[in-house]
């Protein structure tokens, strides 16, 4: 719900590849923000609600639960641990966590060259902590972007946080802004046309500085589709 443009772009790209997307209308926030705010039981309740929303689709043959925000994806992949002591949900949580995929895990195995993208932008990619550290998918998006012909600039200290860090930008704004400015200095050092990332929190935080535009990487793919914007 925080990034409808991103989800719509993902659906269009997946559709071009012959992958159908079934929205789960009853699914909502993954619960990560509740855990950031020390409201664990409320977060577990959100996890249970999402499991209830996704479960019928898995039973009907859905192959994956695809996340476009790496922070949400990392948290959903942890549902099995979060609900391990819940006798009603432990088994379901294990199956849901096993089905969770970041978008790049789906796209990297597809014949992306068939999309015929027009890629003439210089990109700097900010790899979110939740993608490279939590999900251990560092380099995966960059590999897809290069494979499709985007020019990626060199970015120093790519392992560092942008300062968003869940709710950190709200609870520690001064330090968060300092981390953001340091990250933007590194990202802008190669004079990119746009900065790409893979998490809505990072995107909003970096873009909030009003410097180089920051977009989710799937929106850039969608824009580069033949007939795209």
Which residue ranges define each predicted feature?
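Iron-sulfur cluster-binding electron-transfer modules in prokaryotic oxidoreductases
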Residues: 1-229
């Amino acid at each position: 719900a925080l990034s409808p443009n991103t989800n719509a772009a993902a659906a269009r790209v997946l559709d071009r590849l012959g992958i159908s997307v079934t929205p789960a209308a009853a699914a909502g926030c993954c619960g990560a923000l509740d855990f950031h705010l020390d409201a664990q039981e409320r977060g577990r309740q959100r996890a249970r609600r999402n499991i209830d929303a996704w479960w019928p689709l898995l039973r009907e043959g859905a192959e994956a639960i695809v996340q476009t925000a790496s922070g949400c994806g990392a948290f959903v992949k942890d549902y099995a641990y979060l609900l391990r002591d819940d006798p009603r949900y432990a088994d379901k949580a294990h199956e849901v966590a096993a089905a969770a995929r970041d978008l790049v895990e789906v796209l990297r195995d597809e014949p992306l060259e068939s999309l015929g993208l027009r890629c003439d932008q210089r990109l700097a990619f900010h790899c979110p902590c939740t993608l490279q550290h939590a999900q251990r998918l560092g380099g995966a998006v960059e590999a897809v972007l290069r494979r499709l012909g985007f020019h990626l600039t060199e970015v120093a200290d790519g392992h560092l946080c942008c300062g968003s860090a869940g709710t950190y930008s709200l609870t520690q704004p001064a330090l968060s802004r300092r981390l953001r400015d340091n990250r933007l200095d590194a990202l802008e050092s190669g004079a990119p046309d746009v900065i790409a990332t893979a998490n809505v929190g990072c995107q909003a935080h970096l873009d909030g500085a009003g410097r180089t535009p920051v977009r989710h990487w799937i929106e850039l793919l969608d824009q580069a589709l033949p007939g795209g914007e």
